[in-house]
Amino acid sequence: MRARFAPVLFALALWLVCVLPASGVAAEDPRRAATAQVDEAFAYHVGTLGYLYGFTAVDLLQQRYKETHRVSAAQQTLAPVNRLFRFRELLTPATVGALRAPNADTLYLSGWFDLRQEPIVIRAPDTVGRYYTLAITDFDGEVQHVGRRTTGTAKRDFVLVGPDFVGKLPAGLTPVRVATHDAWVLGRVLVSDAADLSAAVKVVDGFDTLTLGEWRRGVRASMPTSEPDGSLPLSSPWTPMVSLDFFATLNRWLREQPRRREDAALLAQFDAAGFGPAVTFDETRLSEGTRRGLLRAMEEARATLRAASLRPIADVRNGWFFPLALGRYGYDHLMRATVAFGGYANLPEETIYAALTADSKGELLRGDRVYRLRFPAGARPPVGAFWSLSAYRLADFSFMPNAAAIYSVGDHKPEFRTAPDGSFAIRIAREPPTSAEREAGENWLPVGEGPYSLVLRLYEPGGAVLDGRYKPPVLETVTP
């Protein structure tokens, strides 16, 4: 009996050894696939939110690194961290560098500041009424201003105070509280024309920065403060906007920044996806599903930002778009990232950037056409400081090169013309107005090849601009 069943038992044992493990593997495959699917989906959705949430900070970190370190032979190093760089010429297409949609009316100051160790003092000279503003941007993109509109033009010492500072500030300093440990300061000083440039340069050179300790001692350290070793980049080559370096950079930044209590639930999701402030992002330990999800998230988020930047603005006046939701974003992470995606801007109380890209028929503005803006007597833009009009190539919002090397027009310039009744016009074309047209109050903004956008800058805009009552004139097409 035992012998009869031995082959059967042997066959059963062989089946248990050979078949069941195979069945086990087959049973595990759906589970493994499900895990990968969940990992990818979760990383994709949370990663998309994370990219939008952190885009501004990572973009500013990248910009800071490029301007404070020599990253290539062709890269201009502006100044070390905690020091100012001064642009002593008005910007042109040849000198604008990476600055997006710059103006051609002011000299720029730029500085990147690390407030972890101690506050930083910015000394502003007496500008004797000359317009200036310093836009102080934290790394969430929130903006504050000091300057003519807010603090006047007399000599003053401002102090940038980070979120962790505890202590009493000395008398004689005007504090500016910054919500992140890092800040970017972009200053503007008005220039009327070439004859005014040397006086404006003296004003720009009058700005200076010191640590609070240097200010107290009255002595500047012999070596300027530079970015701490090993702070950035995290990999070589460092491509934080288009690779998983983004999440590594964001993770490192989040781990050291104070965050709002209201962001806790969102940050917990970032932790679960591997890049929040309570974890350390490690690309080598990501599951394949998580890796795929985060890479997809970056593509989706960038596509969203491209689309968001093309959305129509609700405030449209005679074809001009008035973007007023700039510089203060609260919990609108998409708006914050969209603005950073296209460039950074002043608060609307400081400057409004009204843009026009199409004529009255909805056709894009073109360099081979002639346009005109007519401002009746008494209808100058209502501003407390000045206004200017510039043209930018639609493809990249850079200045339109032109033979006359004129990149803005405005009534703060000595060559600006008005008619005897106070009215004026602006011809927007390759060719200038005739002498008779100039005498009749027609000014000229040259343009170059291809489609472009007009930007009307309004510095210290009046209440009628801010509340929607002011409308720029309709653009006339002179030659179709």
List each model region and its residues.
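Bacterial N-terminal signal peptides
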Residues: 8-21
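N-terminal secretory signal peptides that target proteins for export/translocation
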Residues: 1-6
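Bacterial Sec-dependent signal peptides at the C-terminal "C-region" and cleavage site
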Residues: 18-30
